[in-house]
Amino acid sequence: MNGKLQSSDVKNETPYNIPLLINENVISSGISLISLWHTYADEHYRVIWPRDKKKPLIANSWVAVYTVQGCGKILLKNGEQITLHGNCIIFLKPMDIHSYHCEGLVWEQYWMEFTPTSMMDIPVGQQSVIYNGEIYNQELTEVAELITSPEAIKNNLAVAFLTKIIYQWICLMYADGKKDPQRRQIEKLIATLHASLQQRWSVADMAATIPCSEAWLRRLFLRYTGKTPKEYYLDARLDLALSLLKQQGNSVGEVADTLNFFDSFHFSKAFKHKFGYAPSAVLKNTDQHPTDASPHN
């Protein structure tokens, strides 16, 4: 609103007219989205570029890889290997990528290739841990629905939505450069946990990797993740369990054994407490709606 505010008869209303931007223009780059993949992969998933690439490599494009859960590995042409755990984000230049594959039981990720419409300051090769992964997971689900809509205006909204998310990730990466050593220690531990969810971790085991007391580890986890170490580890195992149950051929007992739960009863109880339904319900739904877990880029 410009000019003067009209007077109001409401006594407790505080009038204001604050110029949030007035002295200069702000120009923000958009993106041209080349491809967007939502991949849920098992241990057989491996992609080699350019052999398996559906579209030609574009020199000025970028690849953003957002790992939802599990573990994946990207091999660059210079021999560098990048291991990705859920939840994390990384930006890479597609011309640098040699291959990528699932490292472990499952790798769920969003793989997006895009070109900025103007200058975009993107940190290349820098991994950032995403603590509020549920928010991004939901937003990317919305993007997937919009981008597959037959309505062009919804496709445009999907790309605008994705541009907003990309800028959030870039801002997060620049903030990461200023983070304290304690947060780096927790992120390193979180990466280790996600890489070995089949292992039975006690809070004492986790604290020993820092090293610190169990009480101090609890305080750090609550500060950075909003969960205790035990809650975080259990949630990560249950999220992976849900994905494994969606894979055809995995029984409830096999998933419980794979993720080192005491037995199927304790696994089912924890699963239902988190998701609100029994693990057997996932198997029934998967049998009715089989999905392809290995799309290629």
UniProtKB/Swiss-Prot annotation:
Name the Gene Ontology molecular function terms of this record: DNA-binding transcription factor activity; sequence-specific DNA binding
InterPro entries cross-referenced by the UniProt entry: AraC-bd (IPR003313), Homeodomain-like_sf (IPR009057), HTH-like (IPR037923), HTH_AraC (IPR018060), HTH_AraC-typ_CS (IPR018062)
What keywords sit in the KW lines?
DNA-binding, Transcription, Transcription regulation
Tell me which residues make up the HTH araC/xylS-type domain: 187-285
| Residue ranges of DNA binding | 204-225, 252-275
* UniProt name for this protein: Uncharacterized HTH-type transcriptional regulator YidL
Q: Which gene encodes it?
A: yidL
